[in-house]
Amino acid sequence: SDLVHLRIFVGAASEVQFMDLKKFYINGQFVDPVSCELFDIINPATEESIGKVALGSPGDVDKAVFAARNAFAKTSRLSKQDRLEILKTIRENYKKRYDDIAAAVRTEMGAPVKLAEGGQTATGLGHLKTAIHVLEGHEFEYNHGDYIIREEPIGVCGLITPWNWPINQIVSKMAPAFAAGCTVVL
């Protein structure tokens, strides 16, 4: 089922070494990029390389969008309860990996401990909590005078995030997209 697939993703993502990101997660599995171009991740505080990340190409984007479009056919039909379960599972895994996420933010951004843990990592967790709270109280279909308004997922969301607020911006964009029933390409 779709929930099983998403649980597999969340579990697989928890096994990723943060600074050795040479594969992309596309269509339920980690895959090699179309091109082999790698980019050094530099800690701005030390100016040292802390790992490498694969650079995506138009071919990688096409593969990811194609997979996300195919997944959208099913995820767009997930119930509100299923979407809540997905967000809660992500939140629980986020909590379990909190220290790892904070360490990754610290080294990737060269951020002080308080900023990485409190400003970045905690804020990401707060975005998940807010998305869950909003979704719990949201109705996707309601009467408006003589009309029925039905809110439906729009499709694949392309998420672009800055280097200086990485986890915060990922979560603040991903959580509402998942709550709405959309798929994402990050």
Predicted segment positions?
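Intrinsically disordered regions, especially transient/low-confidence alpha-helical propensity segments
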Residues: L3, N27, I160-P162
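Hydrophobic residues within membrane-embedded alpha helices
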Residues: L6-R7, P58, D62, Y147, ...
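Conserved small-residue-rich beta-alpha loop and adjacent elements
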Residues: H138-L186
